[in-house]
UniProtKB/Swiss-Prot annotation:
Positions with a binding annotation for Ca(2+) 1: D52, D54, D56, E63
List of residues binding Ca(2+) 3: D115, D117, N119, E126
Binding site for Ca(2+) 4: D154, D156, D158, E165
PANTHER family documented for this protein: EF-HAND CALCIUM-BINDING DOMAIN CONTAINING PROTEIN
Molecular function GO terms recorded: calcium ion binding
Function text: Potential calcium sensor.
Domain of life (superkingdom): Eukaryota
UniProt-recorded name of the protein: Probable calcium-binding protein CML20
Keyword Calcium: yes
C-alpha cells in the first residue's frame, strides 16, 4: 500500500477528463464522523477521491489498478494491505489509517516501487519508467528532465536518490 504516499503527491496531476459521480455525503467534511483534524481532512478526502473514481465511497482493486496502471495481483495486494475489515475494499477510514500509521513502511514501499533493481537508490531512468507506469496526465518526461528532478532531490551529489533523500522530498510534498 506504500504507493498511496506517491498518490498524495501526484493526485492533482491525474487526468481530469474522467466523468466523476458526485462524492458520497460521508466525504463532506461538515458531515463526516471522522476524527481527523480539520486541516488534514481535505487532503485525505482529495486523495481518497482520486482513487474512488466511481464515487461509491470505497476503493476497489480495479480502481487501484486504474490509478497506478499496475497488475491485478499488485492492485489486490495493495487493497489487502489496507483492508482492515476484510470486505475487499479500502474505506476512507482505512486509507486514513494507512496515511497516518503507515508512515515509514509506506514510504519504503513507495521507494521500492521506483527502485526497480533493488540497489537502494533511484536513478533518473528508474524515475522515468516509474512515472510512465503511473501515466500521470500522459506525462512523458525526457531523460534530461528526469535527471534534473534527480539532481534537485540529490542532496549529497552522487547522482541518484537515496531513501533518505526520497523521505525528505516526500515530507516537503506533504
Amino acid at each position: 500500500m506504500g504507493l498511496v504516499v506517491s498518490a498524495a503527491a501526484s493526485c492533482g496531476r491525474l487526468r481530469r477528463s474522467r466523468s466523476r459521480s458526485p462524492p458520497p455525503a460521508v466525504l463532506d467534511p461538515s458531515q463526516s464522523p471522522l476524527s481527523l483534524e480539520r486541516e488534514a481532512e481535505p487532503e485525505l478526502i482529495r486523495v481518497f477521491r482520486c482513487f474512488d473514481t466511481d464515487g461509491d465511497g470505497l476503493i476497489s482493486a480495479a480502481e487501484m489498478r486504474e490509478f497506478y496502471g499496475c497488475s491485478v495481483d499488485e492492485a489486490e495486494e495493495m487493497v489487502a494491505a489496507a483492508d482492515r475489515d476484510g470486505d475487499g475494499f479500502v474505506s476512507i477510514e482505512e486509507l486514513r489509517a494507512v496515511m497516518e500509521g503507515g508512515g515509514l513502511d509506506a514510504l519504503r514501499a513507495a521507494f521500492d516501487e521506483y527502485d526497480e533493481d533493488g540497489n537502494g537508490v533511484i536513478t533518473a531512468e528508474e524515475l522515468r519508467r516509474a512515472l510512465r507506469r503511473l501515466n500521470l496526465d500522459g506525462m512523458d518526461l525526457t531523460a534530461e528532465q528526469c535527471a534534473e528532478i534527480v539532481a534537485a532531490v540529490d542532496s549529497d551529489g552522487d547522482g541518484v536518490i537515496s531513501f533518505d533523500e526520497f523521505k525528505a522530498m516526500m515530507s516537503k510534498q506533504a
